[in-house]
């Protein structure tokens, strides 16, 4: 477009002049007019491009509100379940939490936190929660559930999924878009958009409805990764989206397999996770082992 304007200006027939003064005016003013035209045109093109980006963002948000998140918890439902789960014994440091839900296409449907305001949780855990949800959705199937905790051992050097954690990066534009005052609210800027990302420690779980359909995933972050897993598990159960068809834990679901407890070699060891100890003490493995069973 810019080149066309310049060519058009250069090919314009030079007018006749009746005095040197008229030529001077032509020489000084016309290039300025051409420059202004180019700048204006580029500005319009930029505005159109920005409008297209805004339209795409609006399309995602409209899709979320129009049914793409149907069957998944609302912001209020997610927060209520998350608060209830966080209030139980989960190990860790009993910290406030972030939670996020994505649908099967990886679109964020809800983001919430348990504290009185967004600063009561680790600010960085908002994006981590969404990243965990994206991971659990991205690497689970209708017949096989994988929690983010199940991925830890497999992505270590020499593991069967080594390097997975570096694939599918977080969309930083989505992660940090919008006013911070909206973070964790029903209009969180991530809602209606794809966050991406791969996280390989505890806190992300796939979501299966009563028909055993894989409908998305939940991610929880804000404490030790083991506590995150336990809180995510209780939150999913509270939401009745835990009709898990099968998994790699000893009991055939997507529960965490703790290293040092599962036998070696075994499938569970291949998809295991370290115990989150405090001052060298294991206070969490017994909690994870006693989590409510998934629905059948």
Q: Can you annotate each of these PLM segments?
A:
Residues 33-43:
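Bacterial N-terminal signal peptides
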């Amino acid at each position: 477009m810019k080149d066309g304007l310049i060519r058009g200006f250069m090919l314009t027939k030079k007018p006749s002049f009746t005095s040197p003064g008229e030529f001077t005016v032509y020489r000084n003013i016309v290039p300025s007019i051409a420059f202004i035209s180019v700048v204006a045109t580029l500005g319009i093109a930029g505005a159109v491009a920005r409008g297209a980006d805004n339209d795409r963002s609006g399309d995602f948000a409209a899709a979320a509100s129009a049914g793409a998140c149907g069957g998944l918890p609302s912001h209020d439902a997610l927060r209520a379940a998350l608060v209830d789960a966080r209030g139980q014994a989960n190990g860790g440091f009993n910290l406030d939490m972030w939670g996020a839900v994505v649908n099967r296409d990886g679109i964020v449907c809800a983001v919430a936190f348990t504290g009185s305001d967004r600063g009561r949780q680790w600010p960085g855990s908002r994006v981590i929660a969404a990243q965990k949800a994206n991971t659990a959705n991205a690497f689970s199937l209708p017949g096989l559930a994988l929690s983010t905790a199940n991925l830890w051992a497999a992505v270590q050097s020499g593991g069967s999924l080594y390097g997975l954690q570096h694939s599918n990066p977080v969309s930083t534009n989505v992660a940090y878009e919008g006013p911070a005052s909206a973070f964790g609210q029903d209009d969180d800027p991530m809602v209606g958009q794809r966050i991406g990302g791969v996280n390989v420690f505890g806190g992300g779980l796939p979501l299966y409805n009563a028909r055993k359909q894989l409908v998305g995933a939940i991610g929880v972050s804000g404490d030790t990764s083991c506590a995150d897993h336990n809180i995510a598990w209780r939150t999913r159960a509270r939401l009745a989206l835990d009709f898990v068809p099968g998994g790699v834990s000893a009991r055939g679901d997507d529960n965490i397999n703790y290293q040092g407890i599962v036998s070696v070699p075994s499938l569970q060891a291949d998809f295991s996770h370290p115990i989150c100890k405090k001052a060298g003490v294991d206070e969490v493995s017994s909690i994870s082992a006693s989590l409510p069973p998934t629905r059948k």
